[in-house]
Structure formats: structure tokens, C-alpha cells
Regions:
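C-terminal soluble interaction/assembly domains
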Residues: 327-425
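Acidic helix-start/capping segments at beta-turn-to-alpha-helix junctions
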Residues: 58-78, 168-174, 207-214, 257-261
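Short pre-active-site segment immediately N-terminal to the catalytic Zn-binding motif
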Residues: 130-148, 178
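Short helix/loop segments within enzyme catalytic domains
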Residues: 189-215, 244-257
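Pan-zinc metallopeptidase signature
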Residues: 216-340, 354
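A metal-dependent hydrolase signature that marks the N-terminal structural subdomain at the beginning
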Residues: 27-105
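Catalytic zinc-binding patch centered on the HExxH motif and its immediate surroundings
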Residues: 73-86, 107-128
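Post-HExxH zinc-binding segment in Zn-dependent metallohydrolases
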Residues: 45, 157-208
Length: 425
């Protein structure tokens, strides 16, 4: 039997995704739930989740109450530990360079706000504990659904060891997103199963309407961040359903997905030959821009974020087509002093046609959208399979951009420094 969510559930699921995260976001605050009530409810829902998920409880799920201030501090501390130093700021600079987020965005502040907006609870795989905020009324249907989601994470941890999974790989966002999608997608589908069994006859669409209100931080966040935030739940659930239908529900945990390409195209995960990402090295190990230059950020973007980059510029159809056939990629950002930067990005594609489609679409995106105010059409020249945009050349503030294609590969260079522009890898 093919598993599919009933149509009436999608509105509620969409609303829930604005409420649930690694630290699940707020449900209705009501009367304070005491420890005895929490003990009873967690034990009850744990049994129900275990039965629905088909994973026996190996041990009782530990849980504790926290004040709201303690829980918010916990989330901030976890973010600082998993994204150390200026990692977030360097990610922000890259995202702005390629046009993913507006230049006014403060990525650290926005991310912290998203993770702490009306925080209600979370499961911590390091301690194996479920934390619930004081004053969180666990008797509401919404609260029980969110508890079911987080208890599913506890079960995943007991059986598959979440702490060993690559959820915070600093140099491969695509791998981390694929891993998160398996974990969150599974818990999201469990939550839907729990909801369907426990809350039959309720006006779930009305509940969805109430839940989607009051998400001021989420609504004000850049579209790129909102989509990334929701992707592991929505697309992850569809991936888990596909895996369950084709193989079994635990297959993604026995051998984790390794790319968002596999999440978006489950047949590339469940097929007889998994389509694994190509390992790409953007620059040779001995590449150097000279004195004063420092490599500040290296990462993998992946199919999902490539498609999303086009989507936020109202090119969703073009982006989906351009991102299809992704084989692998890697970028590196170099910076010097306060202003100079040089961005290098190499992508590999399944076919030469895939590479050509990406090159053409990216040229349109940068020329007509991202950098349309920075140069005139006369600045853009085409030579063979390379597109060059050198700006006016009057100052080091002018952007220089190169998109070059060779067979299955597309190489991108963006810099505001003439020396870096002339230094080719």
C-alpha cells in the first residue's frame, strides 16, 4: 500500500512546520504543567509513539522542565557551539555575494530569533533528554503533537544514535541538510500518524489557522531562510514516505542520504544504484592569492539550495530545471582586509546538457537579477563557453564575474579585486 498524507492534513502540517524545529517552536501557553503531569503524559505519548513508529522503547525517555529563559539560553549556547567563531558571519557574506539573502540581513540575529521565537521544548541528543518549558500546557492537542514529534527523535536516538549523524558538518551544508531531512521527515510523518489517530473529528483546519498566526519572526525572515527552515520537514517527510513505500521506513537510518538531490528525487536513494554526490575540489591545494588573503569559508551548496537561489528571484521553474542533474559542487571564499573578496565555485553535472542549462540560467540570474544594478549590458561579454563581466574597471569596488563551462563542469568566480580577477586557478 502506498502511503500518502490525506489532503486535509497538509494545511495543518504546513502550520506545524512553523512551530516545530530541532527545538520545537511555541504551542499554546496555558496553565503551568507540573512535573507529575509531565511525567504521566510523556510516558503515555512515548508508548503511543513507540507503537506507531514500530520502534520499542529501550529505556524511559528522560525529560525535565526549564524556564523560558533557560531554554532560550540553551538554544543560543548550542548554536554557538555547533557554529563556532565567525562561521555564521562568513556564511552570511557568501549568501549575500550570490544573491540568496538581502544585504540588510543579519544572519546570526535572524537565525537566533527563528530558533528562539516562543520556544516550547526540544530533544537534546547529547544528554538524551527532552526539555519542556515551564508554563507550557501539555494538555492541548497541539502540545501533544509536538511532544510526539520530539519523542520520535528520542526513539530515533535510542535505535540509530543521532549524535553520530552528520547534522552539523561545517563544510558540507548539503550533507547536513540531507541528514536533517531524514530525521525531521520521519518525526513529521510520525506526528501526522499520531494526529490522525488521536484527534479524529477535530476541526484541524481551524487549528492550522490559529497555529500559523503570530509567527512574526518567521514571516519577516528572508525567503531563502524560510524555505531552508521548512525543507527538512516537508520534503523530508515526502522522502521518508517514498523510502517506506519502496524499501522500508528504517532504510534511510541504516544508510543515511548523502545529498538533498536524494531527498528531492527519492529514486536516486532507493534505486538499485544510489546516485551518490561527486566529490568536488574547487581549487588545487597549492592555490594562493598572495599575501593578506585568507580562505574564510568553504562549503557545498547542493541541488536544493541552487534551486532555491533561483526561486527567491522569482525564477522557480528555471531554477528547478537548472539544478536538476546536479552531481556535486564546492565553493571557497577568500577575503583580504575589510572589503576585498574572491569567491570561487565549481559544480559538476550529470551530463553536458545539464551543465549547459545551469550555466545559461545562472548567467540570466546574475545579469538580470542579482547584479542588474551594478553594470550595463555592455559590460557582459561571451567568449566560447565563458561569460565574463568585468564592470567598468574604474575601482576595486567593481564586481568582476566569470562563468565558464567545460564539458560537465561549470566554474564561477566573483570578486571585487583586480589582482584576484587576474589570478586564475
Amino acid at each position: 500500500m502506498t502511503l500518502r498524507p490525506a489532503n486535509w492534513r497538509w494545511a495543518l502540517l504546513t502550520a506545524l512546520m512553523f512551530w516545530v524545529a530541532d527545538g520545537c517552536q511555541a504551542a499554546e501557553a496555558g496553565s503551568t504543567t507540573n512535573t507529575a503531569e509531565a511525567d504521566r503524559l510523556v510516558e503515555q505519548i512515548s508508548r503511543q509513539v513507540s507503537e506507531l513508529r514500530g520502534l520499542p522503547l529501550k529505556k524511559p525517555i528522560q525529560h525535565a522542565m526549564m524556564s523560558r529563559a533557560q531554554l532560550e539560553a540553551f538554544v543560543k549556547k548550542a548554536m554557538a557551539e555547533k557554529l563556532p567563531g565567525d562561521y555564521v558571519e562568513q556564511s552570511e557574506f557568501v549568501y549575500k555575494t550570490i544573491g540568496a539573502i538581502p544585504h540588510k540581513t543579519n544572519l546570526r540575529e535572524t537565525t537566533l530569533a527563528l530558533l528562539t521565537e516562543q520556544v516550547a521544548g526540544l530533544y537534546d541528543e547529547e544528554t538524551g533528554k527532552l526539555y519542556v518549558v515551564e508554563g507550557f500546557d501539555l494538555q492541548t492537542p497541539m502540545a501533544k503533537m509536538i511532544l510526539a514529534h520530539e519523542i520520535c527523535h528520542a526513539l530515533q536516538d535510542q535505535h540509530f544514535n543521532l549524535g553520530e549523524m552528520p547534522m552539523a558538518v561545517l563544510d558540507n551544508d548539503d550533507l547536513a541538510m540531507a541528514t536533517s531531512s531524514a530525521i525531521e521527515g520521519d518525526a513529521t510523518w510520525l506526528m501526522m500518524e499520531y494526529m490522525g489517530k488521536e484527534f479524529q473529528g477535530m476541526d484541524l483546519l481551524a487549528m492550522a489557522s490559529r497555529m500559523s498566526a503570530g509567527q512574526a519572526v518567521f514571516d519577516a525572515s528572508p525567503a531563502f531562510m524560510r524555505k531552508i527552515y521548512v525543507f527538512p520537514y516537508m520534503s523530508g517527510m515526502e522522502f521518508i514516505l517514498a523510502a517506506a513505500n519502496k524499501v522500508d521506513r528504517n532504510a534511510p537510518f541504516r544508510a543515511l542520504p548523502t545529498s538533498t538531490e536524494q531527498i528531492l528525487h527519492p529514486e536516486k536513494f532507493t534505486g538499485p544504484l544510489r546516485d551518490e554526490p561527486t566529490s568536488v575540489t574547487v581549487l588545487k591545494p597549492d592555490f594562493s592569492l598572495g599575501e593578506g588573503w585568507k580562505s574564510t569559508h568553504k562549503n557545498v551548496i547542493g541541488e536544493m539550495q541552487i534551486a532555491l537561489l533561483f526561486e527567491v528571484w522569482r525564477m522557480a521553474g528555471e531554477g528547478e530545471k537548472a539544478a536538476a542533474g546536479w552531481g556535486g559542487d564546492q565553493y571557497v571564499m577568500f577575503r583580504k582586509g575589510a572589503n576585498a573578496f574572491a569567491f570561487y565555485w565549481r559544480t559538476e553535472w550529470d551530463t553536458e546538457r545539464d551543465a549547459e542549462e545551469f550555466e545559461e540560467a545562472l548567467g540570466v540570474l546574475f545579469q538580470d537579477k542579482v547584479y542588474r544594478k551594478a553594470f550595463s549590458g555592455d559590460d557582459w561579454t561571451t567568449s566560447g563557453t565563458a561569460r565574463l563581466w568585468a564592470g567598468s574597471g574604474e575601482s576595486d569596488e567593481d564586481i568582476r564575474l566569470r562563468i565558464a563551462r567545460e564539458k560537465y563542469e561549470v566554474f564561477v568566480q566573483i570578486t571585487n579585486d583586480e589582482h584576484a580577477w587576474q589570478t586564475q586557478p
